[in-house]
């Protein structure tokens, strides 16, 4: 997985929650077929696994941008802002799994959830993981995601039980390999919360006309610091963000 950062225009959108009857959701997407060739910045109440089936794209999370290729993937914790966009002339097909925490344990007061899962998902620095085949435990996780793909492509009665099995197995390996020693700085934590807040605000007030000064005032920041907040977290200016938000193209993932 090559690492790179650069700027391009991307947008965000409100994501619908999973159905109350669904414990997970699987969708295959083509970055070239999406509006503006972009997976719009958003976050979810569910865990996400992203696996690249073919090609290459740019994936953005936590002020970083990655060039992710076929056979590589990501894990995203709940509430993590992320996005993706086409890279140069490359096509890219990828699969997204949205996983409800109830797949692991029905209730959060389950002792095993409290012991193994809660410390990870609640840790401020644990936002995402990259998966590359050259790292043995990550390669094993990627193989399990491929098996999940095969099962979802040809589902039979009981296939959800197999998916649940693989998800639990994946979290076992994440638990044994994730490093929770790093602490998120106060500035990073404040940035993330402020970014979510302003994204919700702009979405709810989409029918109103906003200026940089309006957005900065809502964030309780100067104009220049507001611009830096947007560039750090979604790699675009507030003006470009608002302009793209008002476009009539909405992508439903």
List each model region and its residues.
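Generic protein-terminus/edge-of-domain signal
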Residues: 1-73, 79-80, 88, 114-115, ...
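Short hydrophobic/aromatic patch on the recognition helix
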Residues: 71, 225-230
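Ligand-binding loop in jelly-roll beta-barrel domains
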Residues: 79-102, 112
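Double-stranded beta-helix
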Residues: 102-123
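Short, Lys/Arg-enriched, Trp-marked, Pro/Gly-tolerant hinge/linker segments that flank
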Residues: 127-138, 152-208, 212-219, 232-237
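Helix-turn-helix DNA-binding motif, specifically the short coil turn and the N-cap/start of the second
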Residues: 222
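Single conserved hydrophobic/aromatic residue that forms the stacking wall/gate
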Residues: 244-253
């Amino acid at each position: 997985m090559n690492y790179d950062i650069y700027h391009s225009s991307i947008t965000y959108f409100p994501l619908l929650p999973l159905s109350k009857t669904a414990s997970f959701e699987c969708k295959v997407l083509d970055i070239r077929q999406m509006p503006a060739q972009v997976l719009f910045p958003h976050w979810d109440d569910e865990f996400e696994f992203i696996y690249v089936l073919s090609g290459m794209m740019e994936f953005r999370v936590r002020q970083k941008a990655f060039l992710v290729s076929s056979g590589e993937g990501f894990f995203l914790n709940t509430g993590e802002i992320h996005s993706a966009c086409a890279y140069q002339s490359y096509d890219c097909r990828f699969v997204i799994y949205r996983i409800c925490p109830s797949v692991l344990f029905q209730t959060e007061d389950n002792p095993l959830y409290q012991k193994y899962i809660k410390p990870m998902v609640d840790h401020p620095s644990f936002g995402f993981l990259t998966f590359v085949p050259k790292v043995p435990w990550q390669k094993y996780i990627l193989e399990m995601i491929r098996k999940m793909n095969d099962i979802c492509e040809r589902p039979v009665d009981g296939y959800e039980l197999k998916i649940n099995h693989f998800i639990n197995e994946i979290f076992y390996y994440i638990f044994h390999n994730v490093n929770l020693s790093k602490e998120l700085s106060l500035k990073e934590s404040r940035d993330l919360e402020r970014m979510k807040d302003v994204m919700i605000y702009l979405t709810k007030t989409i029918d109103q006309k906003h200026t940089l000064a309006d957005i900065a005032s809502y964030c309780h920041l100067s104009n220049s610091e507001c611009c830096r907040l947007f560039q750090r977290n979604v790699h675009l200016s507030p003006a470009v963000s608002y302009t793209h938000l008002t476009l009539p193209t909405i992508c439903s993932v």
